[in-house]
């Protein structure tokens, strides 16, 4: 670690870092997540972080955290000693007008509450604004200007590019053009831009913004996993597979949401192809819940699939145990044009931490799976290509899977949030 980073925690005046993250408050209850872990390791390094998020539970039209007439409330995450601030926002469900108004609430009320927060916690020395939506970044830039400090804008989701990529918005529409203009405004006015994809700056070049947003302003800090917590959960919260899960077959595990956007139907189609080929040396176990699960279960039954099982929901703390007992973990979601910029799904890094090979059903630029040889990547996301990959894995000697496993375990170290936070610290010290 850089000497100035090592010394940072020993300064008399601890740097006060405000982490703005609309959805970070659920991390308070989950005791994990990107902003939670960054705050945890900043605190351990001698910094003085607070995390500011919405008090509205994501995608719930009723539930509020610590509902109160007050503009904000603060509760300390005792495990890490970091205050979490819950800013008043209306509840919402879905992705329509109510969610947009919830975002506006968080933006406005964060700006309104800021002076009270500064009086209570002390004026910030730097703002670390983390998006899922851009209004959080705008709030960070405005607060930095108010207090005469620097603002780091962290981009975890490209708005509107991701909406365009999923076909929910036309790229040449007036709304998209306005959002692109706002995005460019954010990148120009931020003091540093953090992107979670290794090809993040390639996106800026593709937009034609490289003349006004220099490469040195943009830093790649990947998503990752808290390995210490991951190992603790694996030990303290073991998962017992049902006795009728085959012991003599390759155990393929998918763990995650089961929604239309995840497009798990393609895995069922791949399983049908394998069944027609009389390939039965594997069992595909699908963990998770979602609104598409009932339809997929019916479809699997209608297709007569013998090698596919829906395992249901497991608590987050048991996911490490589930993954560690697999032979191969399947990373799958709908492929989009954004894949060329690299991968940043939280799930991927949990898969690496399990120390088991990864089967990616799509290809990406800057591929960790390819570069680190910790699994295989399917070049085309089709049922036939996925079936071919599974059949190939079934035919491999155990030594091949063992090598992939060892590489995954080693690779996970570089994505430990303890190490990733060192990169955040380097930015903070650069802006000090």
Describe the predicted segments one by one.
Residues 135-138, 142-147, 173-196:
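Membrane-proximal helix-turn-helix segments that form the acceptor-binding/catalytic region
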Residues 279, 294-321:
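Nucleotide-activated donor-binding/catalytic signature segment of Leloir-type glycosyltransferases, i.e.
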Residues 243-271, 285:
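Conserved donor-binding/catalytic core segment of Leloir-type glycosyltransferases
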Residues 262, 317-322, 329-350, 359-370:
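Nucleotide-sugar-dependent
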Residues 205, 209, 219, 224-243, ...:
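Acidic anion/phosphate-binding donor-loop and adjacent secondary structure
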Residues 55, 199, 221-224:
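Carbohydrate-associated surface elements
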Residues 399-414:
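A short, well-ordered alpha-helix in the C-terminal region of glycosyltransferases
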């Amino acid at each position: 670690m850089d000497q100035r980073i090592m010394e940072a925690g020993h300064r008399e005046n601890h740097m006060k870092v405000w982490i703005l993250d609309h959805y970070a408050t659920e991390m308070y209850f989950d005791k994990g997540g990107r902003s939670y872990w960054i705050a945890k390791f900043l605190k351990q390094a001698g910094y003085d972080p607070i995390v500011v998020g919405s008090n509205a539970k994501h995608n719930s039209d009723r539930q509020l955290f610590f509902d109160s007439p007050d503009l904000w409330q603060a509760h300390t995450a005792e495990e890490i000693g970091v205050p979490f601030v819950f800013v008043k926002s209306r509840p919402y469900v879905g992705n329509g007008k109510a969610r947009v108004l919830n975002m506006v609430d968080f933006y406005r009320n964060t700006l309104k509450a800021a002076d009270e927060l500064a009086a209570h916690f002390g004026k910030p020395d730097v703002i670390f604004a983390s998006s899922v939506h851009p209004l959080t970044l705008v709030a960070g830039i405005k607060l930095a200007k108010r207090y005469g400090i620097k603002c780091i804008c962290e981009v975890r989701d490209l708005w509107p590019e991701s909406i365009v990529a999923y076909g929910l918005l036309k790229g040449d529409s007036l709304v998209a053009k306005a959002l692109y203009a706002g995005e460019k405004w954010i990148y120009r006015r931020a003091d540093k831009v953090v992107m979670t994809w290794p090809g993040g700056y390639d996106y800026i070049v593709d937009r034609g913004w490289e003349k006004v947003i220099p490469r040195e302003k943009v830093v790649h800090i990947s998503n990752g996993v808290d390995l210490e917590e991951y190992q603790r959960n694996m030990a303290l919260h073991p998962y017992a597979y049902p006795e009728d899960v085959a012991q003599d077959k390759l155990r393929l595990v998918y763990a995650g949401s089961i929604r239309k956007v995840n497009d798990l139907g393609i895995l069922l189609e791949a399983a049908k192809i394998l069944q027609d080929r009389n390939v039965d040396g594997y069992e595909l176990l699908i963990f998770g819940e979602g609104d598409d699960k009932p339809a997929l279960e019916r479809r699997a039954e209608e297709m007569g699939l013998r090698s596919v099982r829906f395992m249901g929901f497991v608590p987050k703390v048991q996911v490490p145990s589930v993954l560690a007992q697999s032979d191969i973990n399947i990373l799958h979601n709908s492929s989009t044009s954004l894949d060329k910029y690299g991968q940043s799904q939280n799930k991927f890094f949990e898969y690496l931490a399990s120390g088991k090979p990864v089967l990616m059903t799509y290809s990406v630029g800057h591929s960790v799976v390819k570069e680190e040889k910790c699994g295989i990547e399917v070049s085309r996301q089709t049922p036939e290509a996925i079936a071919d990959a599974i059949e190939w894995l079934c035919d491999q000697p155990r030594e091949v899977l063992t090598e992939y496993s060892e590489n995954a375990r080693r690779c996970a170290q570089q994505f430990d949030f303890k190490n990733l936070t060192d990169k955040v610290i380097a930015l903070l010290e650069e802006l000090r």
